[in-house]
Amino acid sequence: MNCVTGAKRGVTACVILMTFGVALFASATASRAQEHAPYIGIGPVTSAPIGWAEFCVEYAPECDTTPSVPRDVVLSTRAWTELKRINIAVNTSVKPMTDMDHWGVVERWNYPDDGYGDCEDYALQKRKVLMQAGWPREALLMRVVRDHNGNGHAALTVKTDSGEYILDNQTNDVLSWADTGYRGHRERAALARYAARRPVNAARQVAG
């Protein structure tokens, strides 16, 4: 996916968000976000992007579709702060590079271990770091959308009890789907889509 675009708010690359703040600010921000974060409508199951399918061949354990925990997490102040921290950390540590320049192929989804990647690689890295921090895999969805210019763009969606939030390499802000301005979406099909909707306390899981 050729999604290496111009920097937005000082962040270079393609998908997922964040900023540090004192506890009081984080609490107020989380409260406001909870009021305006709708769920993305679940449409018919679509075929997974070829890049995701190939990624799951190479990293099969990370694509296990067996639901082990409910998909939604409780958006506590701690969880909100962690989302923002990880989003910013990945956005600032990875530099944008197209798959053709990086791998010599038109499309490849992989981790930006060498410090370079395009939008889906940012999203994959954020997903990986969140899972390592204890977030349930079933709450972290890879999505392909149309950006503001009508181009294909990959991003990470985090499902919470307060709505769905987008971690995007084009901004350091964690936004609700409604606030991104993106159009359409393809949810990765390699995920059990109808897991129980009882919330999981992300803060407890993150505490490990």
Q: Residue locations for each model-derived region?
A:
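Bacterial N-terminal signal peptides
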Residues: 13-26
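N-terminal secretory signal peptides that target proteins for export/translocation
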Residues: 1-9
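Helix-centric, low-specificity signal for extended rod-like, repetitive segments
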Residues: 1-2, 25, 119
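Short hydrophobic "helix-edge" motifs at membrane interfaces and signal-peptide entry regions
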Residues: 10, 19, 49-51
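A structural boundary/capping signal
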Residues: 30-208
